[in-house]
Amino acid sequence: PEFLEDPSVLTKEKLKSELVANNVTLPAGEQRKEVYVELYLQHLTALKR
């Protein structure tokens, strides 16, 4: 899969689905998009390096 350096271009729903697809546990409740962007960077973008 192609992990983005700048995940903020994705929609919040897309971010959430990408995280779930990669077995990342999402925080409870509805979060701001930045929260998911941060998780994406920590878990997915980091894997690519």
Curated annotation (Swiss-Prot):
Alphabetical list of SMART domains matching this protein: Thymopoietin
Region: Essential for biological activity, residue numbers: 32-36
Keyword line: Hormone
InterPro entries: LEM-like_dom, LEM/LEM-like_dom_sf, LEM_domain
Any matching Pfam family: Thymopoietin
Entry GO MF terms: DNA binding; hormone activity
Taxonomy, superkingdom: Eukaryota
SUPFAM superfamilies assigned to the protein according to its UniProt record, in alphabetical order: LEM domain (SSF63451)
LEM-like domain location: 4-47
Protein family according to the UniProt entry: Belongs to the thymopoietin family.
Function: Hormone of the spleen with pleiotropic actions on prothymocytes, mature T-cells, the nicotinic acetylcholine receptor, and pituitary corticotrophs.
Name the record gives this protein: Splenin
